[in-house]
Amino acid sequence: MGSFSMWHWLIVLAIVLLLFGRGKIPELMGDVAKGIKSFKKGMSDDDTAPDGTPKPADQSKTVDHRADDHK
């Protein structure tokens, strides 16, 4: 039950080519690439303000909580 042999991968590749055809696979890969580019652009847009300057880091406050002594 180890990894697949080369013949297994060739059979899988042949089935994929039969199902999708030669023209459909590059189209699918192009759509995936466009999605990745769009995602990266969206992530980089979150890091900049509308005027193009980087947003300042969020200032967080440290709050110390102490248990009250109940006697």
UniProtKB/Swiss-Prot annotation:
Q: Where in the cell is it found?
A: Cell inner membrane
Which GO molecular-function terms appear in the entry?
Answer: protein transmembrane transporter activity
User: What biological process terms from GO does the record include?
Assistant: protein transport by the Tat complex
Name where it mostly resides.
membrane
Q: Per the record, a Pfam family?
A: TatA_B_E
An annotated GO cellular component: TAT protein transport complex
The UniProt annotation puts the region (Disordered) at 40-71
Q: Where are the transmembrane segments?
A: 1-21
Q: What's its membrane topology? A: Single-pass membrane protein
For this UniProt record, give its keywords in alphabetical order, as a comma-separated list.
Cell inner membrane, Cell membrane, Membrane, Protein transport, Translocation, Transmembrane, Transmembrane helix, Transport
Please note every region of biased composition (Basic and acidic residues). Answer: 61-71
- Answer whether the UniProt record assigns the keyword Chaperone to this protein: no
| Superkingdom in the source lineage | Bacteria
Describe its partners and assembly state. The Tat system comprises two distinct complexes: a TatABC complex, containing multiple copies of TatA, TatB and TatC subunits, and a separate TatA complex, containing only TatA subunits. Substrates initially bind to the TatABC complex, which probably triggers association of the separate TatA complex to form the active translocon.
Q: Which NCBIfam families match?
A: PRK00720.1 (NF001940), tatAE (TIGR01411)
Family according to the record? Belongs to the TatA/E family.
Give the function comment from the record: Part of the twin-arginine translocation (Tat) system that transports large folded proteins containing a characteristic twin-arginine motif in their signal peptide across membranes. TatA could form the protein-conducting channel of the Tat system.
Q: What is this protein called?
A: Sec-independent protein translocase protein TatA
